[in-house]
From Swiss-Prot:
Top EC class of this enzyme: transferase
A UniProt-annotated Pfam family: Cytidylate_kin
Protein name: Cytidylate kinase
SUPFAM superfamilies given in the database record: P-loop containing nucleoside triphosphate hydrolases
One cellular component (GO) term of this entry: cytosol
Source organism phylogeny: Bacteria, Pseudomonadati, Pseudomonadota, Gammaproteobacteria, Alteromonadales
Gene coding for it: cmk
Gene3D superfamilies: P-loop containing nucleotide triphosphate hydrolases
UniProt entry tagged with the keyword Translocase: no
A Gene Ontology biological process term: nucleobase-containing small molecule interconversion
NCBIfam families listed in its UniProt record: cmk
Positions annotated to bind ATP: G12, P13, S14, G15, A16, G17, K18, G19, T20
Reaction equation(s) it catalyzes: CMP + ATP = CDP + ADP; dCMP + ATP = dCDP + ADP
Length: 229
């Protein structure tokens, strides 16, 4: 598979700063944005809207192939908007109902294949910034620029703790840390699309580094790999 337009992939575990960097990078370049982590939630919500049974693999595959979804950059670091069929569903897809439904549809092989093709269809001029966990290894394996962001589990737990505290949630940081360690183990050791850097990816440890410094490193690397007009 060859990409039709330049693609920058940004992979890494939750809490490493992928979402913020991808948003800022897409804004800076004026490129399209793909939040692959939201795709299954969006499909699940579309299925709910269209009364499609979550066990109906054939109907879900058809729905996935024609999924009308956009990811728009906002004016703030965490302001990526998810638009489904013209409706802002940024908040809706984060509900527990959507999360549970997403887990069900993600288990269907034909649906996964259809969503893989749908994600690749986001590649369009002038370019695409793809945020995910297997963007550089599976979805856009021939992308000219691959970034892998990581950070210590402790750092990521602290970031998540701060986010939840700011939203008024009462959480325990030790529990968040345990969940992150468990998810890391699951993601890196799974048989299909394990969470690992592509062989040709630039790996950046964001522990203790401000977002502007990370963005500077990324932009410098992008400039070394491709010509951006």
């Amino acid at each position: 598979m060859s990409e039709r337009s330049p693609v920058i992939t940004v992979d890494g575990p939750s809490g490493a700063g992928k979402g913020t960097i991808c948003q800022l990078l897409a804004q800076h370049l004026g490129w399209h944005l793909l939040d692959s982590g939201a795709i299954y939630r969006v499909l699940a919500l579309a299925a709910i809207h269209h009364d499609v049974e979550l066990e109906n693999e054939e109907a879900l595959t058809l729905l996935a192939a024609h999924l009308d979804v956009q990811f728009l950059t906002g004016t703030e670091a965490d302001a990526i908007k998810v638009i489904l069929e013209g409706e802002d569903v940024t908040t809706t897809i984060r509900t527990q109902e959507c999360s549970n439904a997403a887990s069900k549809v993600a288990a269907l092989p034909r649906v996964r294949e259809a969503l893989l093709r749908r994600q690749r269809a986001f590649s369009a001029a002038p370019g695409l910034v793809a945020d995910g966990r297997d963007m550089g290894t599976v979805v856009f394996s021939k992308a000219p620029v691959k970034i892998f962001l990581t950070a210590s589990a402790e750092e990521r737990a602290q970031r998540r703790y701060n986010q939840l505290q700011d939203k008024g949630f009462d959480v325990k940081i030790d529990r968040l840390l345990a969940e992150i360690i468990e998810r890391d183990d699951r993601d890196t050791n799974r048989a299909a699309s394990p969470l690992v850097p592509a062989d040709d990816a630039l790996v950046i440890d964001t522990s203790g580094i401000g977002i502007e410094d990370v963005l500077k490193q990324v932009l410098e690397y992008v400039g070394q790999k491709i010509t951006v007009t």
